[in-house]
């Protein structure tokens, strides 16, 4: 399994509800249709910081998810809400345990 973590700094805090709504309504359904999709999590850390974790079977599928997310931001006209490019970390998942996430 491959994980892609994106950290977004400086997100417009006045648009948090709009952003999270659009992620849940349109981005996650698009990501879930990609080959190898295993999961997606969006984390609001506060102070204009959001992180996301995408899980896919292969690195190539993870890269495809990053391209889709970038296109999605443009298509939804959300670039101004995300003034800084994301910091992206990706790699092979070498340890995990599934459980209930609240």
Q: What are the functions of these language-model segments?
A:
Residues 1-51, 57-71, 78-102:
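Short S/T/G/P-rich N-terminal loop/turn motif that feeds into the first structured element of a domain
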């Amino acid at each position: 399994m491959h994980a892609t973590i994106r950290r977004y700094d400086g997100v417009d805090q006045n648009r948090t509800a709009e952003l999270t709504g659009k992620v849940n309504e349109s981005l996650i359904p698009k990501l879930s249709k990609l080959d190898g999709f295993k999961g997606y999590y969006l984390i609001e850390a506060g102070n204009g910081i959001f992180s996301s974790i995408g899980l896919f079977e292969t690195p190539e599928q993870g890269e495809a998810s990053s391209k889709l997310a970038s296109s999605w931001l443009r298509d939804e006209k959300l670039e101004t809400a995300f003034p800084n490019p994301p910091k992206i970390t990706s790699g092979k998942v070498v340890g995990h345990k599934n459980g209930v996430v609240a």
